[in-house]
């Protein structure tokens, strides 16, 4: 492995959350994947894999070496750095899946909350690329500056009491689409930033899943889309979306915003930073050191 993916879900699983979808028995190796080089193959596997740069989605990513099936790996496109590819292993799948679900249209206002996270930074770029106008919501000046650099037209600090009113004012009455990357009470509140008839796509779990008022949403014609309530995407879908994410990155149309890297021995520090909401951009573990 060259680099291992680190996502907020890893911190939740470490604490025992999500056993229905992600069963873990102690002791276990955390992590869900990363990127590296194939060192050897087993019987019946094409030896041409040896030496190739690949991404891998596996349940033991925080390791210098992992064992994976041929179905769990995918070649890294020529010219794309392994570290960049590792940053897309999960967030690329998440962002492209929700981009497909939310389907932002040219000229629409799109609100991305937790816009400076691994998936949020990608959703900002995807919405801008689709011709939408993006409002990015985050919790610090550094995070808002990153979102603006990625193409957000308007940025708001969602720690301010009036942040929803500011979104509605900037968008002329509310966004057509909200991507909720925060969850919890903040995610539920972000429904108020939608215009009537809008779409609400939530993937945030940092504070638990958002639980918006369904009756109120129905009266306003708002569609509540909560795909993670059904568990992670199946392997075939995840593989398709990861391939698209890698291709987009290789072509320069998608840029993971890697904001923090740690040596493997400091994985706990990576988790602490995510839990404290101090990380700006994507976090990775680098097997060769920091």
Tell where the protein language model's regions lie, with residue ranges.
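N-terminal glycine-rich beta->alpha transition that marks the start or flank
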Residues: 1-35
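NAD(P)H dinucleotide-binding glycine-rich loop of Rossmann-like/cofactor-binding domains
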Residues: 23, 33, 53-116
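A glycine-/small-residue-rich N-terminal strand-loop-strand element
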Residues: 35-58
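Mid-domain Rossmann-like dinucleotide-binding core that forms the NAD(H)/NADP(H) cofactor-binding site
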Residues: 49, 88-160
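NAD(P)H cofactor-binding loop motif with strongest signal on the N-terminal glycine-rich segment
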Residues: 114-115, 182, 205
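Short amphipathic alpha-helix with an adjacent loop that forms part of the alpha/beta core around
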Residues: 163-172
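Glycine-rich phosphate-binding loop and adjacent beta-alpha segment
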Residues: 185-253, 286-290
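C-terminal capping/lid region of NAD(P)-dependent oxidoreductase domains
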Residues: 253-257, 269-290
